[in-house]
Amino acid sequence: MSKFIMIFASMSGNTEEMADIIIEGITEISDVNIEKIDIMEGPEASILGEYDCILLGAYTWGDGELPDDFLDFYEEMDHINLTGKKAAVFGSCDSSYSQYGAAVDILTEKLREQGADIVLEGLKVELNPDDEDIKNCQNFGRDFIKKSLVSSI
């Protein structure tokens, strides 16, 4: 069975709320086990090599930057071969900044550079998830599991 990991950064709780809702969407249609890790726990990027399917979540800091908590992990990703891994990225965003959800784009590009198969376009939610965003997060989880399992057969 495919192994799933989700690593996220959340300062205000919005991205973690997204993470939990995405996991709900996944577990509604599959009994896969997802290891959920807060970036504050200090995981090393090498852990990604142990998993078949990767979800990363981050809010955008300042004017289009990764959160400081994600920087070491991001740099460590340069040394990881993710060829054959299924991946997608999500995050909470703030439209008051000029670069909306840039952290989602930055992480997506890094995963792609390291060989991961990006199975879904990044999911961006304005601040905290409203009712429509909750549905989108659940669908993101469902779509991720479907695309990850189908494409690994």
What are these language model-derived features?
Residues S2-F4, N14-E17, G25-S30, E35-I37, ...:
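FMN-binding flavodoxin-like domain, especially the glycine-rich phosphate-binding loop
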Residues I39-E41:
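Conserved SAM/SAH-binding loop
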Residues F8-S12:
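Aromatic-flanked redox-active Cys/Sec active sites in thiol-based oxidoreductases
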Residues P43-A45:
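Short hydrophobic/charged patches on amphipathic alpha-helices used for structural packing
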